[in-house]
Amino acid sequence: MSIKIENLTHVYMQETPFEKKAIDDVNLEIKNGEFIALIGHTGSGKSTLIQHINGLLKPHSGRIIIDDIDITKKEVKMSEIRKKVGLVFQYPEYQLFEETIEKDIAFGPKNLNLSEEEINKRIKRAMNIVGLDYEKYRDKSPFELSGGQKRRVAIAGVVAMEPEVLILDEPTAGLDPKGRDEILGEIKDLHKEYNMTIILVSHSMEDVAKLATRVLVMHKGKCILDGEPSQVFNEVDTLESVGLAAPQVTYLMRSLKEKGFNISENIFTIEQAKKELLKIFNNKATNC
């Protein structure tokens, strides 16, 4: 499934004293199976952009083409597009409303006019994907769960729609480290096992470096950087100029290099740093 964004522009409160251009002539192509991280300072246009991809917002100019269908046209059935493109908002647990977890997850599939058998199959699959045991949790109230578990239920409700593209807006916001790691692990598995296209909005450069295959940097409504994590995080000066940064481990490794250690400064994850440091220690041990 391909997504093409052509000359996309969106203006809030147009023709008023409070007019603000949130998206400014953005051009992108998202290919099937990519894991894209969308980063940028608050107000850079990230959330506005993803709401256009899902069809929740209409642009003032430009086009969004999903599988050769221009979704900005009035005659397009957006319900069909949203079957393909799922969106998980920030703090999605606040949108839970049913009396049981099973009913909450079933809400989306029921609106697809599926058979009861297919709905039950999707509920079980979605709960399994997010790490919730079906028999244990199906009849529980979602409001009895921890914050991390509520987040999983909310994500399962979108996953049960079986979208080809899953967009997540800060899915780990407000979670403790354990809950955060579990959610990210489940998102990684979705991408790996089902070849699902993932668009992840995140403020964590560490998570982005570890998970994404491509990084888009937004600033004042424009996409100013677009590339693999190694390419984007090498642009430290550009990132810092727009209020962002490279992963902390990158600064650490560059500092060690400045102090005379013979190491690569192009390190962006803890795992990469571990391998690089072990290589140095092993070389020193061999030379002793």
UniProtKB/Swiss-Prot annotation:
EC number: 7.-.-.-
Cellular component per GO, a single term: ATP-binding cassette (ABC) transporter complex
Keywords: ATP-binding, Cell membrane, Membrane, Nucleotide-binding, Translocase, Transport
Highest rank taxon of the organism: Bacteria
Bilayer topology annotation: Peripheral membrane protein
SUPFAM superfamilies: P-loop containing nucleoside triphosphate hydrolases (SSF52540)
Keyword Cytoplasm included in the entry's annotation: no
Stretches assigned to the ABC transporter domain: 3-245
GO molecular function: ATP binding; ATP hydrolysis activity; ATPase-coupled transmembrane transporter activity
Enzyme class at the top of the EC tree: translocase
One Pfam assignment: ABC_tran
InterPro entries: AAA+_ATPase (IPR003593), ABC_transporter-like_ATP-bd (IPR003439), ABC_transporter-like_CS (IPR017871), ABC_transpr_CbiO/EcfA_su (IPR015856), ECF_ABC_transporter_ATP-bd (IPR050095), EcfA2 (IPR030946), P-loop_NTPase (IPR027417)
Compartment(s) where it occurs, according to its Swiss-Prot or TrEMBL record: Cell membrane
Binding site for ATP: G40, H41, T42, G43, S44, G45, K46, S47
Stated family: Belongs to the ABC transporter superfamily. Energy-coupling factor EcfA family.
Entry-linked PANTHER family: ENERGY-COUPLING FACTOR TRANSPORTER ATP-BINDING PROTEIN ECFA2, HEAVY METAL TRANSPORTER
Quaternary structure (record): Forms a stable energy-coupling factor (ECF) transporter complex composed of 2 membrane-embedded substrate-binding proteins (S component), 2 ATP-binding proteins (A component) and 2 transmembrane proteins (T component).
Functional summary from the UniProt entry: ATP-binding (A) component of a common energy-coupling factor (ECF) ABC-transporter complex. Unlike classic ABC transporters this ECF transporter provides the energy necessary to transport a number of different substrates.
Protein name: Energy-coupling factor transporter ATP-binding protein EcfA2
